[in-house]
């Protein structure tokens, strides 16, 4: 006998065909508002729609100059396809309105910056004011760049596009999803075979008999076809959560299909560990415009469970709620390595757009690898490689414009300077001119404590070498050298492709000249001659955080607080075992930065947790690379409003750090929880992995990992659900012991198990102590840390203190 997929019961689901299809899908859009950047070009308000705009001309299309990737203006027809919710440029270029992240007025993209001095592209004021760009596709930051015939035309196009995109993002996401699938059919109604194809495309398959029953159930006029409303109802049926019915009926007090207010109060208290008042319950019922205000239906209850108000992470963590009056060293700081690279370390594209992306994601420490430019103006690129080059001044302008969009807290520039003295002076002039009062006065010599986070709002802190920087000698080891010869980054040249290892040397081995420091640019494991580069006083006087070689935690405690250590990832692993307490104590007043080993040519990442576990504030990751280390980093810095600074837990701060040992099997006394129990219930609308075979339906499974200190490491997996990515159901429970819940993270990833291996679908990472107990929704994220529309996981979380 045929049954519904995963034995789910779809009986008693309200499928009233009288309601409008729009009302069936009322979860808020997961998309962020489009960013409009026009403030420095003109004072025209594009957000106020010009009532004289004729949208018909945009539907028909208008001729415009599009700048190609080679900087050549080409005449193209620009069309707003409102039926398909996309913008069309020429015959091939199509972008969904909902995928557009930003509209920029002027010459503000890599295309414009790269070609604005060419013969094809004018750089006069009028040309700039006639130009605009569309940025889309998430972190890939693809662009379409245009020049209009005049300023009024540009204003009309940008204003119209802004409103169309905003409307597309604000219209209910689920309704958009159903409408999009329906529009792809191009018919007024669909038959059984078409329905089967659509559902397969949506990752749902079942037997023909079950699908016939589903279609019959939704076919209100029994004509063996489904119109849009009937199709909407069928998808609503498949998206429902019948597995929540036993929980619902547990609190109905004998009221059949309704749970009274007292039952709601009991549900929130017992299942969700929340205290709700009668008035709050009534407000919740009112939200769904129900005719009764004394009880809630299962449909509305289910809608709440799967909605924005029931996400797994505590709502207050989406704001800056932590104490920001502590010294800078008390915070974990969201940090980037080789920020300018969009890909491979040896041949990738260097782009200022990566700084925009990284800063908008909440990153507060970015890296600039600066070299002499052929025209006398410093450039940024990955030295001695085939990576492309960008102007240092352009990056500074980007940092000033974007550095404080997510929060007012300071931005740290990690400067890897390989320039001659004249171009160092040029660097200093650029920074003084562009940053101005954002550059704070360097700290006095005897500083024992760094300034508070609050006192450094809107400041740009320069990290780099001074004439007193410790000089390193080059060892004769190769890239695979022993642990005793680990690079400690005395000269902090982690930005260059350098497989040479460094040993610390005594100050006496430094050059007698106090105005030089040493850099090695070797790309092999052989001994290289040290190159000495003089430091310009004009540059040196701007340095706020002075790079300094690390010897030991105890030694660090004796030097001024403005001196910062950079440690290669292997060194950190060594310190976790050899002197964890000393490093934790040193991190009370000093910043410690961890960076990837030089052999990570593919821009892969290291696990940031070992560094965090001993107090290292900055884990400099290749943020252009999506992998578990970056997901863990995103989970950490989704806390405290995503401002880029997260207060270190008590075990790493004065009062507890003196007795803290991350390698001890003893449970931390201040750990809030001793156990976490996770029931993985079900998922909805899991997308196909991009490399999946065309037409196949995914077979999803869930992996749960606790990531923390040495003893907080455990991985569990659910069973595989065959041929169902639309509404898979697991109902599996897992238990995780916790030794230090302050630092522990829960990483959940969903994968497709197929014949060729594991295919990633989505993930979600969250700090354990930020998880709300009870039945909660986790939104799944893609490789770019963007929420996947409509894809979510329903879990129940239980904590034992």
Curated annotation (Swiss-Prot):
Residues 542-652 form the PI-PLC Y-box domain. Its EC number is 3.1.4.11. Residues 471-523 are annotated as: Disordered. PROSITE patterns: C2, EF_HAND_1, EF_HAND_2, PIPLC_X_DOMAIN, PIPLC_Y_DOMAIN. GO terms for cellular component: membrane. The modification Phosphothreonine is found at residue 531. Residues 656-781 form the C2 domain. Residues 471-485, 510-523 have a biased composition (Low complexity). The keyword Calcium applies. Substrate binds at residues 463, 566, 593. Residues 206-241 form the EF-hand domain. The modification Phosphoserine is found at residue 524. It catalyses: a 1,2-diacyl-sn-glycero-3-phospho-(1D-myo-inositol-4,5-bisphosphate) + H2O = 1D-myo-inositol 1,4,5-trisphosphate + a 1,2-diacyl-sn-glycerol + H(+). The keyword Lipid metabolism applies. Keywords: Calcium, Hydrolase, Lipid degradation, Lipid metabolism, Metal-binding, Phosphoprotein, Transducer. The production of the second messenger molecules diacylglycerol (DAG) and inositol 1,4,5-trisphosphate (IP3) is mediated by activated phosphatidylinositol-specific phospholipase C enzymes. This is 1-phosphatidylinositol 4,5-bisphosphate phosphodiesterase. It comes from Dictyostelium discoideum. The lineage of its organism: Eukaryota, Amoebozoa, Evosea, Eumycetozoa, Dictyostelia.
